[in-house]
Amino acid sequence: MQRTPRMENLQARFDAVQDQLIDIYEKDTRSLEVQVTYWNLIRREQALFYYARQQGITRLGLYQVPLTSVSERKAKEAIKMSMYLTSLQKSPFAQLSWSLSETSPEMFFAPPESTFKKKGSHVTVVYDKDSNNAMEYAVWGEVFYVDETDTWHKAQSKVDYDGVYYTDAEGKKVYYVHFADDAAHYSVLGQWEVHFENNVLSPPVTSSFPGGPGRRQRPQTGSYSPGHKAPVTSRRRHSSSSDSHSSRRGSRPQSLSRSRSRSRSRSRSPSGSHARQRAPQDSGTNKSPGRQGGRRGDGGGGRGGGGGGVRVREDTFGGQPTQIAGRLGDRPAKAPEQTSRRLAQLIESANDPPVLLLQGCANTLKCFRRRTSHAHPHKFLCMSTSWTWSCKTTTHKSCHRMLVAFSDYEQRRCFLAGVKLPKGVTCVKGSLEAL
């Protein structure tokens, strides 16, 4: 396609937006004002993509122009984030540190939705008392939400047996995680335990999740309804209140899951009694003379036992081959005495982190770094900023450079095989003692 003045003008405006975005990425400023500027630039970028697609342009520089529906959705998302951040900028929380990840749409629309979040931790819920059947849920230490009057508030998340919630300015609990919802999918018995900050929260009676729209309400217990329940803090409190709850559930029919659990416990009791009957026979065999001699040998203090212990130690630890560490930056202390000096140097240099030195134009390298960081973040360890040699003794060193580091040589091989370098960018291989 022949380039027209209109296309060149569009390309120039797009490059200007990309330069400003790259500057924000490199500076990593945690100011709310910078975050607002960032989302305004994203909106402009998507608007240029939208216009270019309407004009039949499929590429702008190194970037593939997306469909108009994709550009429209991302532009609306950027407008929404810009409006929320502008409102937050007028609140007392504007002076806090805000990073790009904390103001991203993925974080903003995660539960609790339409809130900014900080200081995340996890709560573990074990279903059916099976440690392999457990789920982790996010608990945010700081939740920033806006009310109907465009006023921002900060709340702290809390955990009880029903789920994770925060208390709003009116004193109402706002749940954003309900454990009963996942219990309907992951639990067979309808039971779960909540492990949070070295505390275990469990119900005073065996709980099963009922069906229907009102499955979170348990009026028979009187302690776990979202409206008026008191948070449970330890097992000791459950045991002290079990008498009062047992009278309330007397008229309630027994659930199928509880009857199955009792049948399993009764079926295990015969095997347990059989094991107790066999115990005297086993203890009698321990008193035989041959067994007593073996026990003295195991202790290491008798005449027949000391040598056996030494032989086991020699077989276990003796003659192990020398292993060369394969982790990043690790080196063997010294090469074996049988190897030559050149071979020892090769062994030492084999563990140095491999790198690639890219050469090309500054803007091309910056765009390549941004594109690769989004599309192939797992294929390299880290990338440097673009730089040049300060003492230019020859004109051949005038191009910009950028280093790409890898954890091992296999990762570098996969990078060269799966990532295409831009036109005009060359690379050379190398390694460093450390990063």
Curated annotation (Swiss-Prot):
Q: Which GO terms describe its molecular function?
A: DNA binding; DNA-binding transcription factor activity; nucleotide binding
Assembly and oligomerization = Binds DNA as homodimer. Interacts with protein E1; this interaction greatly increases E1 DNA-binding activity. Interacts with protein L1; this interaction enhances E2-dependent replication and transcription activation. Interacts with protein L2; this interaction inhibits E2 transcriptional activity but not DNA replication function E2. Interacts with protein E7; this interaction inhibits E7 oncogenic activity. Interacts with host TAF1; this interaction modulates E2-dependent transcriptional regulation. Interacts with host BRD4; this interaction mediates E2 transcriptional activation function.
Q: Where in the cell is it found?
A: Host nucleus
Its recorded name reads Regulatory protein E2
Q: Which residues form a coiled coil?
A: none
What residue spans carry the Polar residues bias annotation? 280-289
Protein family according to the UniProt entry: Belongs to the papillomaviridae E2 protein family.
